[in-house]
Amino acid sequence: MDPKTSVVPPALHLVDPQIQLTIIRMEDAVVHGQSNAVPKVYPIILRLGSQLSLSMARRNLDSLEARAFQSTPIVVKMTKLATTEELPDEFVVVTAK
């Protein structure tokens, strides 16, 4: 049996190491300035043949909820194709068309 097919359940997408997403937390960009923000790079897990679109969603920075949200440390590790509903609003997310 092929080792790859034995460890990757059909429900999971295959990881393409050549496709990566650079994420800059809005908190870092606001506090340190955009030029000083350190982007984090995550692998994107795709279904073969998927087309990608990049979108940015963010909270209203004038609201108290947004300020509290920004001050909360967030750690995200992408393990599947993400949608805006599955990641915090301050992150750039990738969706399949």
UniProtKB/Swiss-Prot annotation:
Keyword Membrane annotated: yes
Domain of life: Viruses
Domain 9b as annotated: residue spans: 8-97
The entry's keywords: Host cytoplasm, Host cytoplasmic vesicle, Host membrane, Membrane
Membrane topology designation: Peripheral membrane protein
Pfam families: bCoV_lipid_BD (PF09399)
Cross-referenced CDD domains: SARS-CoV_ORF9b (cd21955)
Compartment annotation: Host cytoplasmic vesicle membrane; Host cytoplasm
InterPro entries associated with the record: Protein_9b_Betacoronavirus (IPR018542), Protein_9b_SARS (IPR037223)
GO cellular component annotations of the record: host cell cytoplasmic vesicle membrane; membrane
Assembly with partners or alone: Homodimer.
Miscellaneous remark of the record: The gene encoding this protein is included within the N gene (alternative ORF). Bat coronavirus 279/2005 is highly similar to SARS-CoV (SARS-like).
Protein name: Protein 9b
Organism: Bat coronavirus 279/2005
